[in-house]
Amino acid sequence: MNHPNPAIVTQAGARRLPRWALLLLCFAYALPGFLGRDAWKSEDMAALGYMAELVRGTSSWLHPTLIGLPTDNPAVLPYWLGAWAMQLAPQWVSADFAARIPFLFLLGLAMVTTWYGTYYLARNPLAQPVPFAFGGEALPADYARAMADGGLLAFLACLGLAQLAHETTPALSQLSFTAIFFYGMAALPYRKQGPTVAAALGLLGLSLSGAPSLAILFGIGSALLHYNDRSTDIVDAASKRRIAGESVAIVVFTLISTALAVALGLLRWKIELPQAQWANWHGYIELLIWFTWPAWPLALWTLWRWRYQLFNRRISRHIALPAWLLLVCAIATLTTGSSDRTLLLALPALAALAAFALPTLKRQVSALIDWFTLLFFSGCAFTIWVVWIAMQTGVPSQPAANVERLAPGFQASFSWLSFAIATLATIAWVVVVKWRVGRHRAAIWTSLVLPAGGAALGWLLFMTLWMPLLNYAQSYTLLVQRTKAQLNAPGCVETVGLGKGQIAAFQFYGDLQLKPMQADGSGNCPWLLVEPSPDLSAPATINNLVWTQSALILHPANKGESVLLYKRQSAALSDDSEQPEAIEPDLDQKSEKK
């Protein structure tokens, strides 16, 4: 039975978003967060540490380690990319920024492939709008282009994308290769070599980026969907053979990437079933709601309005393909320890599904989205500006007191460049809002302009006005500086209990030679860094006959990241006896005031 297509779009509604505006939005979203910041705790910093170990030659390229510790995520490609960038960068480029450059391109690649993937899904004959009796419906190419604009806007609007998409971690690499695979499968009916290469590259990249099990499920399921795709009623024998060959090729690429993952020891089935407790499920529900907002309600509406095309004897690729990728990621989110980073991979497919809701939205629903977005992001921008003013002037007093409580000892600094960029972004937001509430012919993508623009505005304001505060609270830089100040002659330093982010920070920003502590005390390092107990006391595992506590060094914003510094007895006896001291977060500022 043939059911009516729910998409009714005129040619006027299929006009495309101006290219300059779309590119400006993408650059405004992508660049902040990669520029002008330190590596943040702890996954971002730990990944940088593994890359630095590869550059120094102290780790195997096939099995990256950090002072002998393996990676938490069974990945190699993200660390290779960062290490190669650090090796190729000129000396005047800082190593941590050089490591971010390939990840900036990965984010851009995810944006481009999400746009093209949505475009080719919209070119599907079953996705095209209903033809009018006297003409005037949207042309296929124009309709697909407008839908792709909406898909990219939905992708950028997702709240969970911002931070994880600007880290040098395997999560961003997995996102990019998922989007590449999504594009390859979406474009496969319309192109030959390009989409096939993209699908193979996506599967291979996913496997080498720590997600080989997802690559297996993506590849097998998508190959079955492609084999059973009957977008048109006329399919000759040659077309059937071509579709079968392409499906077999996808399966072969899946097997090759799986074999490579097994050979490198990257395939680890780590399934953690959720416990039957409301607290756990409540956390998952909250994550799904805020992380994928505002795409998830639109995606649900798509599944409802296009349900006859989804549950039909004829495979509707434009709904079935993103729905399959979304289903795999949603299940993996429930069965993995890093739920947010797994859910990140669902965003390209989720954005495509959200785009197909746009031709079916009523005007009242579109207006509701606009007003909610306007109030939410305008309120966020106002709050960011008020807190920044409080950091600079102390007025209003309550936000200034909150900053002092959360980041003791933080001293605000003023940057004309950051202020100018933030001001221009805020003015641009006002202009976009004025344009959106004005009277003009509505294109199908207009409902997502404010969500995407608001997400970009909030992220850009965070990365300009609040960057000094975020660096102070989210990095290990100050902790490393205070630790180095306590070392008379920073030779090698033994460690016990430190997180991988801390280890990487002490090695990368502190130039310390860290080694794991020898249980029998046979090491020759004069210093020892230890993770303190929850009450900041010394752990019982430290041999007081070998080590003498020298200082407790507090992280400026998180006491859980503090460290205890010990001196070996043989080195301590040669110095004057001193009582252990606590290095407070505002110690430097207090001494300056005195």
What are these regions, as identified by a protein language model?
Residues 27-29, 33-61, 273-276:
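Aromatic-rich transmembrane-lumenal/periplasmic boundary elements in polytopic membrane proteins
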Residues 2-16, 20-23, 168, 187-594:
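Membrane-embedded architecture of ER/inner-membrane glycosylation machinery
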